[in-house]
Amino acid sequence: MTDAHDPAFLRRFADDWLTAWNSHDTEQVLALLHPRIEWDDTVFWPEVIHGRDAMRTYVDRIWAVMPDVRFEEVQLFTAPADGRALVLFRQEGSGPPQLDPGKRFSTHGCDIFLGFTDGLLSRYLAQYEITDMMRQLGALPPREGKVGGAYLLSLMSRNR
């Protein structure tokens, strides 16, 4: 039986996690998820996803919009007493085909493992900087010195 409170389990899971995502094989990613996964990546997806079956659409969409994305671990942080871990990563790749195919992105993010059930990830939270990624791909304008939410608000005024 696997124990999420074991530092070796958390290390092994993080390694398997990055291997699965870098494989671009949906089944390999889904195999790490508990059937009742709660997946919170509302940076990218419009709502929290519930259940492994619902994850297939999400994972396939990742491959469609970032066809050659690669993830590299920067550092693993673990809280074995709580059965949690955080993978600080760098992601690099190109964007969707409708954007400039010559442009690439390179940003940091975090995969936050909030819970495990039966050795599978059951609660997940994603955090990463999508606006910087979109600027690097040419989909958003430069910040031009705008601070905080002022940049996002300036994008709204461009569309009026």
Stretches found by the model and what they are:
Residues 1-160:
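C-terminal and inter-domain tail/linker signature
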